[in-house]
From Swiss-Prot:
Pfam families: DEAD, Helicase_C
GO cellular component terms attached to this protein's record: nucleolus
Primary gene name: ROK1
EC numbers for this chain: 3.6.4.13
Statement: the UniProt record of this protein carries the keyword Metal-binding: no
Bias type Acidic residues, positions: 71-82, 266-277
Organism from which the protein derives: Cryptococcus neoformans var. neoformans serotype D (strain JEC21 / ATCC MYA-565)
UniProt name for this protein: ATP-dependent RNA helicase ROK1
The protein's assembly and partners: Interacts with the U3 snoRNA and is associated with the 90S and 40S pre-ribosomes.
Catalytic activity line of the entry: ATP + H2O = ADP + phosphate + H(+)
Main subcellular localisation: nucleus
């Protein structure tokens, strides 16, 4: 049989073997010594370096199929980034950290790291028919053991204790409440049809953004696969299914009401979302009708944003009187002034005497913590993983002075061209307008980029996030709407293009990388206008063990009023790039507004004159 090299060079072509020695050796037979020290000739085509099928022009070379080597199992949590919600990639556990429990004695015992301790808990032991499918689903999702926060929070919840958890980003908080909630529910609502226990919203998860709600729903589906658990995200399309499962007084009496809603931080154009059955709905379909759920089939787990859920409660369309488990994920954000007017009525509506609450976040300011304890029985059990309100230690953090807005763009382009910004990456900016500006600029640079912010429709945001997860998009330009809870395990670098307004904002932003024990990198740009707040962020870097120049730590501390002012509104900045046609962008906006106002005045004047002329005609 002719060699592969002969086949490729047939036809009289001459080839300089010395000049292209390295390339030539790819097709040469190699020699290696066996265990006895004798030389042994190896045909490269029979080994792993077989001739690619694209080069096998004559089709006479075998293409052996090599079985992949089995990957060693490791203690890991599932990577819930794929559409199916599971992954076969082993994920390293986060670095071990001290876990502190405080609260009323006796304090609950933490679970063991092995999974059977979850389903065989003395307070809520499951049968093999109940626990077997859960363990199988966890195995399929590549979850082989529990992590520290999951052991601590799981132990608290399974002993029926209200819990307040503060744990770093990427430490596994979502599973820490999803798994024990499923164990305590025991059976899906479908198996409890016709009983009181199988009615209503059985467990409720409240989150600040729609994007996080969709992600949590993916986690729930992954670990409940095989037992027909009923879980859903509350959207315009699923409203009807929700209030049919847990009807309020307005639904029972047939009253009508307004269904228009927008979700605070999750604002944007509402789109028709698919419900459980794949159907879509419009606003007109949500007026109370004859129930399409006559058996009163309950919802095992409902994931909702505050504004839409509060609207259903306020209009008496839904009842949460049967809800036994309430979880506030990113609770410090939900207990802030933006969401508190909606969250308090939601908590009050969960009037079941046996209701159990769990509040979790990566950051918990003193004000939010004291407010949370008022809603927890006996103040709850406080679980702190590592150092409270600190950044994740697996992220290499740095601060970069850019001088101006044009300097920011230049620095970003330099990072990209020098290979210091590997894909996939997240770029945080402070507003919707700036996100769109930077997105359009990077598109013109030929980068596969997309933008996600509150001004985009939900379906467009979901599509952009999906493309980012599968690698169709290399970079995402995002606002704070994606800073909390979103799990992008593959993100290697986070760029704070605009300086974060608060320490919690910084911690949550950089927490999108370095998740589940993986290394990550965060670079924060700053200019002159960010100087007064630089020391605050520099202290976070120092507490995480990252090097910080001394001059930053010696800078004047910002006053409380300055911090409050920055938290309420970001500093005004020039347009992205800081020059060219964008330099007078604000002036152009004002001029346009003045022209439009002038046109309106003239139009009103004309209408007024026309009306007077008609009156004069009538008088005549």
């Amino acid at each position: 049989m002719a060699s592969a090299f002969s086949l490729l060079t047939a036809g009289g072509a001459k080839f300089d073997k010395n000049r292209f020695k390295d390339d030539f050796q790819l097709f040469e037979a190699k020699k290696r010594k066996d265990r006895k020290g004798k030389s042994k000739q190896i045909d490269t085509l029979a080994t792993g370096s077989a001739l690619p099928s694209s080069l096998d022009f004559f089709g006479d070379h075998p293409h052996p199929q090599h079985k992949p080597e089995p990957e060693p199992e490791s203690e890991s949590e599932s990577d819930f980034e794929s559409d199916s919600g599971s992954s076969s990639t082993s994920i390293p556990a986060p670095p071990p950290q001290k876990i502190t429990l405080t609260g009323a004695e006796p304090l609950p015992k933490s679970l063991h790291t092995n999974l059977p301790s979850l389903v065989n808990h003395e307070s809520h032991s499951l049968t093999s028919a109940e626990g077997g499918p859960l363990l199988s689903a966890l195995s399929r999702a590549n979850i082989h053991s529990l992590w520290g926060v999951q052991c601590a929070v799981g132990g608290c919840l399974l002993e029926d204790r209200d819990t307040l958890c503060v744990a770093p980003t990427g430490s596994g908080k979502t599973l820490s409440y999803v798994l024990p909630t499923i164990v305590k529910l025991r059976e899906p609502a479908r198996k409890l049809k016709g009983t009181e226990e199988g009615k209503g919203v059985r467990a409720l998860v409240v989150v600040p953004t729609h994007d996080l709600a969709v992600q949590i729903q993916g986690v729930i589906k992954a670990v409940t696969m095989g037992r027909h658990w009923r879980s859903m995200v509350l959207t315009k399309a699923t409203e009807k299914a929700v209030w049919e499962s847990a009807p309020g007084e307005a639904v029972k009496t047939g009253e009508d009401g307004d269904s228009e809603i927008k979700d605070g931080e999750d604002s944007g154009d509402e789109e028709e979302d698919e419900d459980d059955n794949g159907s879509t709905g419009s606003v007109d379909e949500f007026a109370p009708k004859v129930s399409g759920n006559p058996e009163g089939l309950g919802i095992d787990m409902l994931v909702a944003t505050p504004e839409r859920l509060h609207h259903l409660i306020d209009s008496r369309r839904i009842s949460l009187a049967r809800t036994k488990y309430v979880i506030l994920d990113e609770s410090d954000r939900l207990l802030s002034s933006d969401f508190l007017p909606q969250v308090e009525p939601i908590l009050s509506a969960c009037s079941n005497p046996a209701v159990q609450k769990c509040f979790l976040s990566a950051t918990m300011p003193a004000g939010a913590e004291s407010l949370a304890k008022k809603w927890l029985k006996d103040g709850g059990v406080r679980v702190v993983v590592g150092v409270k309100d600190s950044a994740v230690t697996t992220v290499d953090q740095s601060l970069l002075y850019t001088g101006s807005e044009s300097g920011k763009l230049l620095a970003l382009r330099n990072l990209i061209s020098s290979g210091q910004l590997p894909y996939p990456s997240l770029i945080f900016v402070q507003s919707i307008d700036r996100a769109e500006e930077l997105y359009k600029t990077l598109v013109l640079d030929g980068i596969k980029v997309d933008a996600v912010h509150g001004g985009k429709a939900k379906t467009k945001r979901d599509e952009a996030i999906k493309d980012f997860r599968v690698g169709a998009v290399w970079m995402l330009v995002v606002t704070e709407v994606l800073a909390r809870g979103m799990d992008f395990r593959g993100v290697k670098v986070v760029i704070n293009y605009d300086f974060p307004q608060t320490v919690p904002s910084y911690i949550h932003r950089i927490g999108r990388t370095g998740r589940a024990g993986r290394p990550g990198k965060a670079i924060t740009f700053f200019n002159i206008e960010d100087g007064p707040y630089l020391r605050t962020i520099a202290n976070v870097l120092r507490s995480s063990g990252c090097p910080v120049p001394e001059y930053m730590l010696d800078m004047k501390k910002p006053t409380k009023n300055e911090k409050k002012k920055l938290a309420k509104a970001p500093p005004k900045r020039k347009a992205v790039g800081g020059g060219g046609r964008d330099l007078n962008r604000e002036a152009g906006k004002k001029k346009k507004q003045m022209v439009e106002a002038s046109k309106k005045r003239k139009m009103l004047e004309r209408k007024g004159k026309g009306g007077n002329e008609e009156k004069n005609d009538d008088e005549e």
